[in-house]
C-alpha cells in the first residue's frame, strides 16, 4: 500500500464557487398542481443553483481556485499540494484533479 506524507502543511484558504442562476423548485414544469409544494416540504429543497449548458464542476473549481490565489496574492507555482473535492466527475480520464493541477503549470 502506498502512503503520502507531506510535512509542514497549513491551510491558508478555502474557496467554493456556485453558479449565479437560481431555479425555484416550485416553478419547475415537471410537477403537477400541488406536487411541488409537497416535494419541497419533504426535502427542504426550495431552490437550486444552475450552471449554463456546457459548464462543468471543473469550470467552477477553476474559478474558485483563481479567486483564492488572487485573494491570497499567491503565484500558481508556489502551490505544493492541491486538494480537489467533488461529488461529480466531468471526464472519465483524466480526472478533474489532474486537469486542475495542469492548470497550475
Model-derived regions, located:
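Conserved "HGTGT" condensation-loop signature of ketosynthase/thiolase-family condensing enzymes
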Residues: 1-83, 102-105
Amino acid at each position: 500500500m502506498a502512503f503520502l506524507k507531506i510535512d509542514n502543511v497549513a491551510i491558508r484558504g478555502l474557496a467554493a464557487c456556485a453558479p449565479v442562476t437560481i431555479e425555484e423548485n416550485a416553478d419547475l414544469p415537471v410537477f403537477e398542481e400541488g406536487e411541488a409544494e409537497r416535494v419541497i416540504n419533504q426535502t427542504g429543497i426550495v431552490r437550486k443553483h444552475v450552471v449554463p449548458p456546457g459548464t462543468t464542476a471543473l469550470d467552477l473549481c477553476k474559478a474558485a481556485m483563481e479567486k483564492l490565489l488572487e485573494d491570497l496574492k499567491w503565484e500558481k507555482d508556489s502551490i505544493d499540494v492541491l486538494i480537489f473535492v467533488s461529488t461529480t466527475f466531468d471526464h472519465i480520464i483524466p480526472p478533474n484533479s489532474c486537469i486542475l493541477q495542469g492548470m497550475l503549470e
